[in-house]
Amino acid sequence: MNPRKKVDLKLIIIGALGVGKTSLLHRYVHKTFYEDYQTTLGASILSKIIILEDTTLKLQIWDTGGQERFRSMVSTFYKGSDGCVLAFDVTDLESFEALETWRGDVLAKTIPMEQPYPMVVLGNKIDLEDRQVPQEVAQGWCKEKDIPYFEVSAKNDINVVQAFEMLASRALSRYRSILESYLTDSIKLSPEDQPKSRCC
């Protein structure tokens, strides 16, 4: 019986200040929710081990500060990431409109590959009534960008696990594709490179 493969993945969660990034992360990693989280300064990191597609994944998830003054510093944390959660607050239109900028920041800082960089968008706080971003609008934006969209509630534990695990699955697929491509390129010999047989 083959031992289960182990893969480390770095994921990041980004978005405007106050959209609930820390709440989402703690809901996913610790299955907890608190009303009053302190503002994240810079970045904090949480880890979670899951089993997906017969692979043990160690997810290192970076929770980044959403303040404008931290944006240049936060962008350095994008490097080497395997996937990204873009979060906004469905009761805050500005946080949704800022997704374009956050997405652009990530794509500018990650190394372009043949395989697209995995992202998911989370519309958080669907438990609240004063909604400003219609579901169809968010879905339309995501469809245009070919990014999966989830309506979530960190407070009521709605769709949080599903969203993170879809991102993990996409990040794992990309990781495998890159690894396979790298190994194929490394061992591929062109006809000119192949050793010629010689008679003694």
UniProtKB/Swiss-Prot annotation:
Positions of disulphide bridges: none
Pfam families reported in the protein's UniProt record: Ras
Keywords: Cytoplasmic vesicle, Endosome, Golgi apparatus, GTP-binding, Lipoprotein, Lysosome, Membrane, Nucleotide-binding, Phosphoprotein, Prenylation, Protein transport, Transport
Motif Switch 1, chain ranges: 28-41
Subcellular location, record wording: Late endosome; Lysosome; Golgi apparatus; Golgi apparatus, trans-Golgi network
Any one Gene Ontology molecular-function term assigned to this protein's record: GTP binding
A GO-annotated cellular component: late endosome
UniProt-listed SUPFAM superfamilies: P-loop containing nucleoside triphosphate hydrolases
Modified residues (Phosphoserine): 186
InterPro entries assigned: P-loop_NTPase, Small_GTP-bd, Small_GTPase
PROSITE patterns for this protein: RAB
Lipidation (S-geranylgeranyl cysteine): 199-200
Binding locations of GTP: 15-22, 34-40, 63-67, 124-127, 154-155
GO biological process, one term: negative regulation of toll-like receptor 4 signaling pathway
Domain description: Switch 1, switch 2 and the interswitch regions are characteristic of Rab GTPases and mediate the interactions with Rab downstream effectors. The switch regions undergo conformational changes upon nucleotide binding which drive interaction with specific sets of effector proteins, with most effectors only binding to GTP-bound Rab.
Family from the record: Belongs to the small GTPase superfamily. Rab family.
Summary of the function given for this chain in its UniProt record: Controls vesicular trafficking from endosomes to the trans-Golgi network (TGN). Acts as a negative regulator of TLR9 signaling and can suppress TLR9-triggered TNFA, IL6, and IFNB production in macrophages by promoting TLR9 lysosomal degradation. Also negatively regulates TLR4 signaling in macrophages by promoting lysosomal degradation of TLR4. Promotes megakaryocytic differentiation by increasing NF-kappa-B-dependent IL6 production and subsequently enhancing the association of STAT3 with GATA1. Not involved in the regulation of the EGF- and EGFR degradation pathway.
Full protein name: Ras-related protein Rab-7b
Gene source species: Bos taurus
Lineage of origin: Eukaryota, Metazoa, Chordata, Craniata, Vertebrata
Gene: RAB7B
